[in-house]
Amino acid sequence: MAEKTFKVVSDSGIHARPATILVQTASKFNSEIQLEYNGKTVNLKSIMGVMSLGIPKGATIKITAEGADAAEAMAALTDTLAKEGLAE
């Protein structure tokens, strides 16, 4: 299992476009990948789930991945969050 906490730095938070990018990245992996914010946890492969969280700038989020490719999934998601200027 891989787990990592991030701080959202994007001025718009995680809205439709970045949520889509995260879901696309997560969907490349077989692991179960969850996104947690404000006490709620959703499947990171679900665009509706991610959008339902309404994650603003400054929020602390946690991503967990469990499965055979969990480490690779976490590395890809960490890279995507950094490259897109979403979180650090």
UniProtKB/Swiss-Prot annotation:
Name of this chain's protein: Phosphocarrier protein HPr
Pfam families, per database record = PTS-HPr (PF00381)
The reply on keyword Transcription regulation is yes
User: Which positions bear Phosphoserine?
Assistant: 12, 46
Q: Which NCBIfam families match?
A: PRK13780.1, PTS_HPr_family
Q: What does this protein do?
A: General (non sugar-specific) component of the phosphoenolpyruvate-dependent sugar phosphotransferase system (sugar PTS). This major carbohydrate active-transport system catalyzes the phosphorylation of incoming sugar substrates concomitantly with their translocation across the cell membrane. The phosphoryl group from phosphoenolpyruvate (PEP) is transferred to the phosphoryl carrier protein HPr by enzyme I. Phospho-HPr then transfers it to the PTS EIIA domain. P-Ser-HPr interacts with the catabolite control protein A (CcpA), forming a complex that binds to DNA at the catabolite response elements cre, operator sites preceding a large number of catabolite-regulated genes. Thus, P-Ser-HPr is a corepressor in carbon catabolite repression (CCR), a mechanism that allows bacteria to coordinate and optimize the utilization of available carbon sources. P-Ser-HPr also plays a role in inducer exclusion, in which it probably interacts with several non-PTS permeases and inhibits their transport activity.
Q: Where is the active site?
A: 15
Keyword annotations: Cytoplasm, Phosphoprotein, Phosphotransferase system, Sugar transport, Transcription, Transcription regulation, Transport
